[in-house]
């Protein structure tokens, strides 16, 4: 059998940490890189960088949703340890009927990352095996020559540093220990590792962009310039330099093909594929607390003047005070009815009042009976089967009732020869001589519906 676990909890620390975890992180760059030149390979590289950046931003949004779920779980964990102090005060100010709202900012648990896909690969394509020297130089010298690539790289490098500064929110708790704290810290650690990985991928995007800018610079330095080619074409028209110009043009063409071939190969960038964010730990909100007033409801009388007792419930019975110890446990209804029957068999001169025999208790006093009781009208009811348990038992019960009531009348043996031969069916046909219907006997016979006075 597992032993109870002692935990340390600082609820406010958990709530503050939830706010930290949910706080927005740095915004990733949104600029789209431009091709550094007019070469096909350069355009493909720029498109690949844009596609990779779009997918990284999409994954970062999914990670933000997981952090929100993690924050929700932290708030639910804090709520499970009890209400916040000021919210509890609000509940008391509302006469005990205030409620502490459970945090529920969306479903916590498994993240909805099914729609995330790998970054597609842009079709690798470059210049044809043979490209006219002048055309190649014209394309190579067009474009911004890598300026937007450098800006793109700077943006993602800065974002990388920002992400690394944001992981402080995933530190361990100082004043929360226990299994729940360990599980939440493990989930936060997963989020931290994922953020660090996304920071590395951000640096990878920046590295690819910087590489393209450097590749463009290298190609410009190694490829014959458009101005040199134009000058060579002019010299080729001069008979004195024609042969030398044709030979130099062939060398330029060979150099151009080598530069373009290497450019096409190196500009074939790999897509940046981020991993899916880890699913945040799922902690369901605690069940809503039942509103409880400062005074228990069963002690508060309803406003309509009724007794406030639920259907089927009876008030607590007052225990008998005059019965002798060791008296058999006789049903109260049987005891009371038997006493009434015994009273009916007594002579008028004895002065015994039915009230003194009610339930074997220590007598309820000589309160005057109401008109309805004396008239024997609606207050008289047919006797139940359990009300008349036989003359012998009735006599004995009545004797105990009067003895308990202080009457002291000897009733022993009254059951012999006094109605003991009556059949059970005949007893059931009889009617009770008297049924008490006053507030003074409620504690003995229970609450009954008040009858209209006639």
UniProtKB/Swiss-Prot annotation:
Gene deletion effect: Mutant is extremely defective in intracellular growth.
Primary localisation category: secreted
Any Gene Ontology CC annotation: extracellular region
Region (Disordered): 17-40, 82-128, 391-454
Subcellular localization(s) per the UniProt record: Secreted
Transmembrane parts of this sequence: none
Regions of compositional bias (Gly residues) in chain numbering: 391-422
Gene3D superfamilies recorded: PPE superfamily
Domain of life: Bacteria
UniProt KW keywords: Secreted
Signal peptide from the UniProt entry: none
Post-translational modification: Cleaved at close to the C-terminus during secretion.
Domain notes: The C-terminus is necessary for the co-dependent secretion, for maintaining the EsxA (ESAT-6) cellular levels, and for interacting with EsxA.
Family, similarity comment: Belongs to the EspB family.
General remark: Secretion of EspB, EsxA and EsxB is mutually dependent.
Protein name: ESX-1 secretion-associated protein EspB
């Amino acid at each position: 059998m597992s032993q109870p676990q002692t935990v340390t909890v600082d609820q406010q620390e958990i709530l503050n940490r939830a706010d930290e975890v949910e706080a927005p992180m740095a915004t990733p760059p949104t600029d789209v890189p431009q091709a550094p030149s007019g070469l096909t390979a350069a355009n493909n590289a720029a498109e690949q960088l844009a596609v990779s950046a779009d997918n990284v931003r999409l994954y970062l949004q999914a990670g933000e949703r997981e952090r929100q779920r993690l924050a929700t779980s932290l708030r639910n964990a804090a709520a499970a340890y009890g209400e916040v102090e000021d919210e509890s005060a609000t509940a008391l100010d509302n006469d005990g009927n205030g409620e502490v709202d459970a945090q529920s900012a969306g479903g916590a648990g498994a993240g909805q990352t099914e729609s995330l896909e790998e970054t597609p690969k842009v079709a690798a394509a470059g210049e044809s095996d043979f490209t006219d020297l002048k055309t190649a130089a014209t394309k190579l010298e067009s474009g911004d020559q890598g300026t937007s690539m450098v800006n793109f790289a700077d943006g993602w490098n800065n974002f990388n540093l920002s992400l690394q500064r944001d992981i402080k929110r995933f530190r361990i708790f100082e004043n929360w220990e226990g299994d729940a704290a360990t599980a939440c810290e493990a989930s936060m650690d997963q989020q931290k590792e994922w953020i660090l990985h996304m920071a590395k991928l951000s640096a990878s995007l920046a590295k690819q962009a910087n590489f393209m800018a450097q590749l463009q610079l290298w190609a410009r330095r190694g490829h014959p310039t458009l101005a040199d080619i134009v000058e060579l074409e002019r010299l080729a028209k001069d008979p004195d330099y024609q042969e030398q110009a044709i030979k130099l043009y062939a060398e330029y063409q060979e150099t151009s093909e080598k530069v373009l071939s290497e450019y096409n190969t190196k500009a074939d960038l790999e897509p940046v594929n981020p991993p899916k964010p880890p699913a945040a730990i799922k902690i369901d909100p605690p069940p809503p607390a039942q509103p409880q007033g400062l005074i228990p409801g069963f002690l508060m009388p309803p406003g309509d003047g009724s007794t406030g007792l639920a259907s089927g419930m009876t008030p607590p019975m007052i225990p008998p005070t005059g019965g002798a110890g060791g008296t058999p446990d006789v049903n109260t209804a049987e005891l009371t009815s038997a006493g009434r029957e015994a009273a009916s068999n007594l002579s008028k001169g004895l002065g015994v009042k039915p009230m003194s025999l009610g339930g074997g208790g220590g007598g309820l006093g000589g309160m005057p009976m109401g008109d309805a009781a004396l008239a024997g009208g609606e207050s008289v009811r047919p006797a139940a089967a359990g009300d008349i348990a036989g003359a012998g038992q009735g006599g004995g019960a009545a004797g105990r009732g009067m003895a308990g009531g202080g009457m002291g009348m000897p009733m022993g043996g009254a059951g012999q020869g006094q109605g003991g031969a009556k059949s059970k069916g005949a007893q059931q046909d009889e009617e009770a001589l008297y049924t008490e219907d006053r507030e003074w006997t409620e504690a003995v016979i229970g609450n009954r519906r008040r009858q209209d006075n006639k």
